[in-house]
Design a protein with these regions (language model features):
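N-terminal signal-anchor module of multipass membrane proteins
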Residues: 1-56, 60
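C-terminal ends of transmembrane helices
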Residues: 9, 57-69, 106-117
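Short, amphipathic, aromatic/basic-enriched membrane-interface segments that mark the entry/exit
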Residues: 12-22, 63-74, 91-93
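Hydrophobic, membrane-inserted alpha-helices
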Residues: 28-35, 59, 78-86, 102-106
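Transmembrane helix interruption/hinge and helix-loop junction motifs
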Residues: 38-45, 89-98
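Hydrophobic core segments of alpha-helical transmembrane domains in multi-pass membrane proteins
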Residues: 47-54, 97-105
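Cytoplasmic-side transmembrane-helix entry/capping segments in multi-pass membrane proteins
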Residues: 70-80, 97-103, 118-129
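Long hydrophobic alpha-helical segments that form multi-pass transmembrane helix bundles
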Residues: 117-161
Length: 161
């Protein structure tokens, strides 16, 4: 070993592809998504669905019309970004704010740095931070968890007795 060989990462390789890793993370997040749906109801489903659809559509538009390259939505990274963004947002958030967050997450947080693997920050968190700065009132208004249950499990405050 007389020479120092410098090459771009990754330096350790496995048989897993990017697509396989992305979909494995999506499967791992499925239980958390189900719990959020049970806890926050239809609002959580709408936020997750709008976020995922907006992220996938934004990535498709940017790769097709701005970069003029084949679409990269098949790798699952836009779906994962949309899911992570949706899980970071209140379930009562209006759909148009979610779309703005998805556009910022994919457009600014991911694609402006060259796409998958080139971003310096997590794109979903870039979208969340932007929304928190742009819409602080809506982003800090969280609905009561478990309001869809018809019973009270415990009371943790003073009672009239």
């Amino acid at each position: 070993m007389d020479r120092l060989i410098i090459s771009p990462s990754p330096h350790i390789h496995s048989g897993d592809s990017v697509e396989r890793n992305m979909y494995a993370v999506l499967i791992a997040l499925a239980p958390a998504c189900l719990v959020s749906l049970v806890t926050f109801g239809l609002g959580a489903f709408i936020v997750l669905a709008v976020s995922v659809l907006a992220c996938v559509l934004t990535e498709w538009v940017i790769t097709k019309y701005l970069y003029k390259q084949p679409s990269t939505i098949g790798d699952g990274s836009a779906i994962l970004t949309g899911l992570l963004l949706g899980m970071n947002l209140p379930s009562s958030l209006p759909w148009w704010i979610i779309v703005i967050g998805a556009i910022v997450a994919i457009g600014v947080g991911k694609m402006s740095f060259g796409g998958l693997g080139g971003n310096i920050f997590n794109p979903a968190l870039v979208g969340r931070v932007f929304l928190l700065i742009a819409y602080p009132a809506q982003m800090t208004l969280w609905p009561k968890a478990g309001q869809y249950f018809s019973y009270t499990d415990a009371v943790t405050s003073a009672t009239p007795l």
